[in-house]
UniProtKB/Swiss-Prot annotation:
Residues 67-381 form the AB hydrolase-1 domain. Homodimer. One of its GO terms (biological process) is methionine biosynthetic process. Transfers a succinyl group from succinyl-CoA to L-homoserine, forming succinyl-L-homoserine. In vitro, also has serine succinyl transferase activity. The gene is metXS. This is Homoserine O-succinyltransferase. It comes from Bordetella petrii (strain ATCC BAA-461 / DSM 12804 / CCUG 43448). Pfam families: Abhydrolase_1. The lineage of its organism: Bacteria, Pseudomonadati, Pseudomonadota, Betaproteobacteria, Burkholderiales. InterPro entries: AB_hydrolase_1, AB_hydrolase_fold, HAT_MetX-like. One of its GO terms (cellular component) is cytoplasm.
Length: 424
């Protein structure tokens, strides 16, 4: 059984989102917390007996329930995809420039769902939630999750809304991995799969970045083995360093050079160095600021959990490394977008997915955008990038006969249509 209740929004906007809502915003939005009481089996062999998902929706679900789009979030984002949070008008959705009336993903035509993943810290059940077996926060005892676990939880959310098949599942970065997993795991439930700035698996270098970030957190004296809640403390130093490491990988070398170069923060007289170990350069000040800000709102155990889910994602692992064979179950049409200066998930990784899809005869559209902003480009305004996404959704709208805005709300189903997996 599922039960929706309103909850305060807990998802602050990441650094790359705009400071104010874009024209054509969906306006003020209030999230819901939807409870699931059917146990969710996990890839680890464990299960969650019950759990809650924080959700926001935009637009209107049409009578046939055919115009739904699921937006999957990246590492530090949340269900707050678009609009202004009801409890904080300064909290703008992390993809507000993409989702809304008249925007590339047009909420005048599509019913858009944003969901906070299990294990996160913005409302859905996660390490900071109360473990019903103990009456205390889960902490380190919260199960390790995979991208596939998230997809199974999201499929139950689709059941809650009575959605048998999504018009599209869309995501950038880790969100793109979820979209790809949807196409493999629940092929009959995805008409279009939109994968942006993503990869079919993490490289050794990327796993290395994640491990260094995790070690920074775990070795913080305030971590207390993951049970820092009981000690009324937070491993802020480790979490701050983890964010600094991650933030470097989200920006391109050229972008950092243009933003900061070798500009000194507060040089000594005549521009001399100060010959110390405090902040000397502007880039150091920026990274410290980003790290400290992040450590004030993100949960350290969630950071460990999500980076490990990133590490584990590898759909071709079960097919001897043959990505085409791993993608063979997919029935969706695909759009892939990459960015020229993204060195975290470079264009070659998207092209690898494209080649595998073409080998299978899957319909695929691919765009490589020449943009200077690195991995974070998928969050930013870029006319060429947005034109590609807009054009693709125009095609979906034509296929569904959505030339006019959706009319007549279809109420969400009171009970899930299925209890397990992806069967509608």
């Amino acid at each position: 059984m599922t039960t929706p209740v309103p909850v305060p929004n807990g998802g602050p906007a990441p650094a790359a989102v705009p400071a104010a809502a874009e024209p054509g915003s969906v306006g003020i939005v209030t999230p819901q917390l939807i409870r699931f009481d059917t146990p969710l089996p996990l890839a680890s062999g464990q299960s969650l007996q019950s759990y809650e998902l924080a959700v926001e929706t935009y637009g209107t679900l049409n009578a046939g329930r055919t115009n739904a789009v699921l937006v999957c979030h990246a590492l530090n984002a949340s269900h707050h995809v678009a609009g202004l949070a009801a409890d904080d008008p300064n909290d703008v959705g992390w993809w507000d420039n993409m989702v809304g009336p008249g925007k590339p993903l047009d909420t005048n035509r599509f019913f858009v769902i944003g969901v906070n993943n299990l294990g996160s810290c913005f409302g859905s059940t996660g390490p900071a939630s109360i473990n019903p077996a103990t009456g205390h926060p889960w902490g380190a005892a919260f199960p390790v999750l995979t991208v596939e676990d998230w997809v199974h939880a999201q499929a139950r959310l689709a059941d809650h809304f009575g959605i048998e098949r999504f018009a599209a599942v869309m995501g950038g970065s880790l969100g793109g991995m979820q979209a790809l997993s949807w196409a493999i795991t629940c092929p009959e439930r995805v008409a279009h799969c939109i994968v942006i700035a993503s990869t079919p698996r993490l490289s050794a270098q990327n796993i290395g970045f994640n491990e260094v970030a995790r070690r920074a957190i775990i070795t913080d004296p305030d971590f207390h083995g993951g049970d820092y809640y009981a000690h009324n403390t937070v491993p802020r130093r480790g979490l701050s360093v983890a964010r600094m490491i991650g933030h470097i990988t989200y920006l391109s070398d050229d972008d950092m050079a243009e933003k900061f170069g070798r500009t000194q923060r507060e040089p000594a007289e005549g521009g001399a160095y100060r010959y110390g170990y405090d902040v000397e350069f502007e880039v150091e000040s920026y990274l410290r600021y980003q790290g400290e800000k992040f450590s004030r709102y993100f949960d350290a155990n969630t950071y460990l959990l999500i980076t490990r889910a990133l590490d584990y994602f590898d759909p071709a692992r079960g097919t001897g490394g043959d990505l085409a064979r791993a993608l063979k179950p997919a029935q969706a049409d695909f759009l892939l977008v990459s960015f020229s200066t993204d060195w975290r998930f470079p264009p070659e990784r998207s092209r690898e997915i494209v080649r595998a899809l073409l080998k299978n005869g899957s319909p695929v559209t691919y765009a490589e955008i020449d943009a200077p902003h690195g991995h974070d480009a998928f969050l930013l305004d870029d006319a060429r990038y947005h034109a590609v996404v807009r054009g693709y959704y125009e095609r979906i709208a034509r296929e569904l006969g959505l030339d006019e805005p959706a009319a007549g709300a279809a109420p969400a189903a009171a009970e899930p249509a299925c209890a397990e997996g992806c069967a509608a």
